[in-house]
Amino acid sequence: MAYNHRISQQFHSSQQHGRGSRKKEDENDALMRLPDKEIAGCINDIGIPFTAADLIKPNPQQVQMVLEWFAELLMNTTRETVEPAMRAAADDICGDFPDIVPTDTRNLMGFFVNMRRLMAECGVNDFTFTDLTKPTHDRLVKIFSYLINFVRFRESQTAVIDEHFNKTEKTKQRIETLYTENQEMEQRLEEMRRVLKANEAEVKEKVRRNDELKSRLRELGRTQEKVAETLERVKAEKARQQNLLKEKMERTVRTRQEVEKLRPYVMESPASLQSSLTELSESLLREKNQIDAMEKRARALQTSSDTFTVVSNDVQACIKLLEDIAVELQKEEDEESRASRNKEAISERGNNVREVEQTEKLLQRQLARWNERIEALRNTAHEKAQVAQKRMEELREVQIKLREERTEKQRDMERRRIRIEQTEKKMADLKESIETEIQSAHDEYLKLESHIKLYITEMEKSL
């Protein structure tokens, strides 16, 4: 196999560049590295039995246990905490074949991802899965040294870390409190809306009844006015009838007096009058001197008779008028009793109306107070809802930023993983090419050696 000089030069140049960067890393590692006994003592201090011999000949399970303790201390992450997420990922990827990836391996891979992030924060940027499964002494010294130094630095900055952690916890508690208050305010707002709807129906019913009572009151007022007018007319008619009755009674008394005066004349019979007339006519001759007086008396009697007839007719008319007046008086008394009952009913209705008006005013004041309270609560709830909404928007923005950062980190991790795989592939190809060159160089060396031996043999023969 021929020797490739170009590949050899490229390999040497890459080796020189790698040696330069490795030299800087070695200087940093030299500053950060701790003695084996100090590392073992620190691990023993955390409660895990560990010796320098365990560091020289590492056990993967023991190393994983120590790293898991550091991860739990610094990130609150263990294989148990990543198990649900890894199980869900396995269910999504493997589907009906969950046994393709064993549970321990799956959890260890999830733990490795978190551990690699921690190691990157500690300064170990070349942490690989092999450091968990096949650790070496040099790698463990570097990893544990960086971890212990990071823990020491963290302990020296405990006050600042606790301050930021307390701020974070307070922020979380404040968010939870605001969310709870927002939920409570929403429930109270819904309850107030339901109460407002119920009160609106009741108030509408009260207003409707109030309007009905007002219309009824107006009708009663108009009826009262009509009854008052009728009562005034009846009173005027009563006064007129009383005056008329008084006049009729006075006329009746005068008529009765005149009748009493004329009664002696009326009680005499016609026969006696005829006899008297005969006697008068017989004595006419004897009493010629009394003829004029008798004629006057006869005319007076005729006048009295006509007057009696007229008075009798007037008495009959007065009796009939008295009967009509009695009927009218009875009607008037009935009207007065009805008017008094209507007046009492009107006064009672007026009292009811006043009570209704007072109740309405009270309900209006209560409604106004409730409306003010509801408006104040609504404004307060609206302000708190706006504040909560703004806070939720801020939290959403923070969440979006965190998601973007997480996505970017995942993409970066994926790019790094691809880059690492490509680098490993290049290294494998380069290793293969180097081995091929070494093999070809070895073959060339063997050929040259055989040629030289042959040449020496020939030279010896020729000598």
Curated annotation (Swiss-Prot):
Keywords: Cell cycle, Cell division, Centromere, Chromosome, Coiled coil, Kinetochore, Mitosis, Nucleus
Biased composition annotated in UniProt, kind: Basic and acidic residues: 337-354
Compartments where located: Nucleus; Chromosome, Centromere, Kinetochore
GO cellular component: Ndc80 complex; nucleus
InterPro entries documented for this protein: Kinetochore_Nuf2_N (IPR005549), Nuf2_DHR10-like (IPR041112), Nuf2_N_sf (IPR038275)
Region Disordered: start-end pairs: 1-27, 331-354
Predominant localisation class: nucleus
Coiled coil: 166-455
GO terms for biological process, alphabetical: attachment of mitotic spindle microtubules to kinetochore; cell division; kinetochore organization; meiotic chromosome segregation; mitotic spindle organization
Bias (Polar residues) ranges: 1-18
Molecular function GO terms recorded: microtubule binding; protein-containing complex binding
Quaternary structure and partners: Component of the NDC80 complex, which consists of ndc80, nuf2, spc24 and spc25.
General function of this protein: Acts as a component of the essential kinetochore-associated NDC80 complex, which is required for chromosome segregation and spindle checkpoint activity.
Family of the protein in this entry: Belongs to the NUF2 family.
Protein name: Probable kinetochore protein nuf2
